A protein has these predicted regions:
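Active-site clefts of carbohydrate-active enzymes
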Residues: 224, 245-276, 302-305, 346
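Mature N-terminal, pre-catalytic/accessory segment of carbohydrate-active enzymes
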Residues: 18-20, 24-125, 133, 148-162, ...
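Aromatic-Pro/Gly-enriched surface loop or interdomain linker
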Residues: 50-58, 65-75, 81, 328-475
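Helical hinge/lid and interdomain linker segments adjacent to catalytic or ligand-binding clefts
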Residues: 92-103, 114-121, 125-128, 425-524, ...
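Carbohydrate-binding surface patches
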Residues: 380-420, 474, 496, 600-632, ...
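A glycine-rich, often tryptophan-bearing local segment used as a flexible ligand/cofactor-contacting loop or short
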Residues: 485-570
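Substrate-binding cleft/loops of secretory-pathway carbohydrate-active enzymes
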Residues: 145, 149-152, 198-243, 265-274
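Catalytic beta-strand/loop cores that center a nucleophilic Ser/Cys/Thr
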Residues: 514, 546-609, 621-626, 652-701
């Protein structure tokens, strides 16, 4: 029973998890009270406190990466009911047998234990004797066991993972307290901060967080040291890597990793011939995007999931229709006992001997063998442009119509802006333009794998305004805002210094608002930072709003840098624009898109110092201006804002990039390819996401051009230039 409680909670909230609004698995009232400090701090006070000193986690010499899987108890019986969720637990294997089998079959080099106290200490000791590394998740230990265990294991111990412990606490009467995003973050971070400190004080070592939520940056800001996104329920694995890698660089963390919940959340049926191929692809993707620890959550030692429509689990007896049934002795007597003998005859469908579990182990074993032949690349991949995750962006990495930000459904009844809306849609806008998801699993949908035709990017978190212009300039040529942001004078100073220092900033009116209560549909000049005086950042002041404008177009009959020409319309827009008073010299400005009636600017290039701002001049979030059904619109168009993001991403290219045969732009084949370049290793990695067709690209590295043809699903490694520390475009 130890392993199923979290899974039941996660299963019921699968869709919401992908929107980062789900209840965390162990985040009940008891846990909240235990984690709530007596004297709470503000989030600013928390981030101002010195962080625990850490070093980069050393990687194994043999593979240079930790490849592992979860260790669960197998006690036999029905663990929960539900006509879609019935989950049976087989009897094979016992803990010790599993540890031994992992070492014998070389199913990776790491085990993630779910056990507690002396059992945990004994199993990790056994794993160490067999040459394996250990970590744990949700584990508890008393009487100094944790410290004694970690000191004994030394480098064989990787840290404690508190899993999906946290969510935003709207169980309190927030409405009468005047709910703000700031208040939610303060309460959230206080609980994380206290728990992380307790784990450190108990001697657990590095603290990890595994979660599908998009608020992982606030857990890191509160003291967590190793972010491990729960990949697959998170959604886009490439975007998840950008978040983990960005936090790794920003907070100088020991490492970042991935928790592959493939069995639960890959969601495609076994009848799809590429069901298991996607697990192999996930391992390759994480390897080539910089993860140094990859844990396969389940599937290889026994099956758990009921979220695959034709999983062998669906062939087990189903007697209890409601998942909400309290699973106690009476329930077992009623629902389990009558069919237990029948179920036992089918344990071979779901235990480690089953064909599906064997496939999982074979894929992990083969990937570990690959890593021993091709050790994971040193350092992190080059990522020279970033997506900004704005301050107080708590909604999620995409739009879910029925989801409320922070689960604030009560607040949303009075203020519908607490429901997902244009800020969350704007994440979809930027992702679809520069991180497309090809239909690689047809007829099933691909919701997990995005290509990188414009190269890898990081996510730069503005959580708590805890970021500096120095960090941004050392790492990113281009910084693009899309989703929610609450601006402040401190943040405005960072943005000004970034642009003056040479950065390219893509930002809009909405992102410079100081609103912290989701009142974004009622924008005013008074809510803008500096009262709308953006002279230092952009060279103009915002005086107010123009009348609504309905169509955008190019300013000239000659195509500009975005490819826009006059009379090719983008829209409908239906948006008021910023009424601007220009302060800087006229030559500092270039109008890139204007309205088709009076030529009021939609998008303006504002040159400033060594850098520039690509300014979105409408009173709403970017997605509001990306509808594209106007004169000249084509099927493959990505919208006005989409083209802006693509142009900016090209400005952010590093030493290595791919294009089509025009040598300038990614073509359709590039939209099926993930690539990365590791300057410390001197290698380029390319992965064709198309399982059925060759895909071609021009690999451009350090001025050279190579025409490549990747076979279906090919993962290719190419020698490149190894850079010295002062030559790299990212500061490690």
């Amino acid at each position: 029973m130890e392993s199923i409680k979290p899974k039941r909670a996660v299963a019921t909230m699968a869709c919401a998890l992908m929107a980062s609004a789900a209840l965390a698995v162990n985040d009940n009232d008891t846990t909240r009270r235990a984690d709530s400090p007596d004297k709470p701090l503000t989030s600013a006070e928390i981030v101002a406190k010195p962080r625990r000193a850490t070093v980069k986690t050393p990687v194994p010499d043999l593979a240079r990466i930790y490849i592992g899987s979860g260790v669960y108890g197998n006690n036999g019986g029905m663990n929960c009911g539900g006509f879609c969720f019935t989950y049976w637990n087989p009897t094979k294997l016992k803990y010790d047998e599993l540890v031994d089998l992992c070492a014998k079959e070389e199913v990776g080099n790491t085990l993630q234990f779910w056990q507690n106290n002396d059992t945990l200490a004994r199993l990790t000791r056994r794993a160490t004797k067999l040459g394996l590394y250990s970590t744990c998740i949700y584990s508890r230990a008393t009487n100094g066991i944790a410290r004694a265990m970690t000191e004994e294991l030394g480098d064989r111990w990787l840290g404690h993972d508190f899993g999906e412990r946290y969510t935003f606490s709207l169980y309190q009467n927030w409405d009468n307290r005047g709910a703000t995003l700031d208040a939610l973050v303060d309460e959230y971070m206080n609980r994380v901060h206290k728990h992380v400190n307790n784990l450190h004080n108990d001697g657990w070592g590095n603290v990890m967080a595994t979660s599908a939520n998009f608020s992982l940056d606030y857990e890191v800001a509160a003291g967590t040291e190793v972010p491990c996104t729960e990949d697959f329920p998170f959604g886009d694995l490439t975007l998840a890597s950008a978040l983990g890698r960005g936090l790794y660089r920003q907070y100088d963390l020991p490492m970042w990793g991935s928790h592959l919940a493939h069995e639960w959340y890959s969601w495609i049926p076994h009848r799809n011939p590429y069901k298991m191929k996607t697990l192999e692809t996930a391992f390759q993707l994480k390897y080539m995007t910089g993860a140094k620890m990859i844990i396969n959550e389940s599937g290889n030692w026994q099956l758990q999931s009921s979220l695959c429509e034709d999983s062998p689990m669906s062939m087990m007896p189903i007697t209890c229709r409601k998942l909400s049934t309290k699973w106690d002795k009476a329930a077992r007597e009623k629902y389990e006992k009558p069919v237990l003998k029948e179920a036992e005859k089918r344990y071979s469908y779901i235990d480690y001997r089953s064909p599906v579990a064997t496939k999982y182990r074979n894929i992990i074993r083969d990937f570990y063998a690959f890593c021993k032949r091709n050790p994971a690349p040193k350092g992190q991949p080059e990522a020279t442009w970033a997506l900004a995750k704005g301050n107080l962006d708590l909604g999620g990495s995409g739009y879910v119509a029925g989801s409320a930000v922070c689960g604030a459904y009560d607040l949303a009844r009075k203020n519908p802006n607490w429901m997902h809306g244009l800020p969350e849609m704007s994440w979809d806008t930027v992702r679809k333009s520069v991180m497309p998801m090809p239909p690689m699993l047809a007829p099933n949908k691909n919701i997990h794998f995005s290509a990188t035709p414009y190269g890898l990017c990081d996510i730069a978190s503005f959580a708590c305004d805890n970021i500096t212009a120095e960090h941004l300039l050392k790492n990113y040529k281009v910084l693009m805002f899309s989703g929610w942001n609450t601006c402040s004078p401190k943040q405005y100073r960072v943005l000004c210094d970034y642009v003056k220092g040479g950065g390219v900033l893509v930002i809009g009116l909405c992102h410079l608002s100081t609103d912290n209560a989701r009142n974004y549909t009622d924008p005013t000049v008074e809510k803008l930072v500096n009262g709308g005086d953006f002279t230092e950042l952009c060279g103009f002041k915002v005086k107010g709003q123009t009348p609504r404008r309905y169509w955008a177009t190019g300013p000239s009959t000659t195509p500009n840098c975005l490819g826009f020409v006059a009379r090719r319309r983008f829209g409908y827009m239906c948006l008021p624009l910023g009424d601007l008073e220009y302060v800087a010299p006229k030559e500092n400005f270039e109008e890139l898109a204007v309205d088709d009636e009076d030529a009021d600017p939609f998008i303006i290039r504002c040159r400033n110092g060594k850098g520039q701002v690509l300014f979105m001049n409408w009173w709403s979030y970017p997605a509001a201006a990306n509808m594209d059904v106007g004169c000249g619109a084509e099927i493959a168009d990505v919208g006005m804002v989409g083209y802006l993001y693509q142009y900016a991403a090209k400005l952010g290219r590093g030493n290595v990039f791919i294009t089509g045969p025009d040598f300038e732009n990614p073509d359709e084949d590039c939209r099926w390819i993930i690539y990365s370049y590791f300057p410390d290793e001197g290698k380029v990695y390319l992965l064709n996401l198309d399982y059925e067709r060759e895909r071609k690209c021009v690999l451009q590295q350090f001025g050279d051009k190579d025409f490549l043809t990747l076979k279906p699903a090919e993962f290719r490694i190419i020698d490149s230039v190894k850079l010295d520390a002062d030559e790299k475009l990212n500061a490690e």
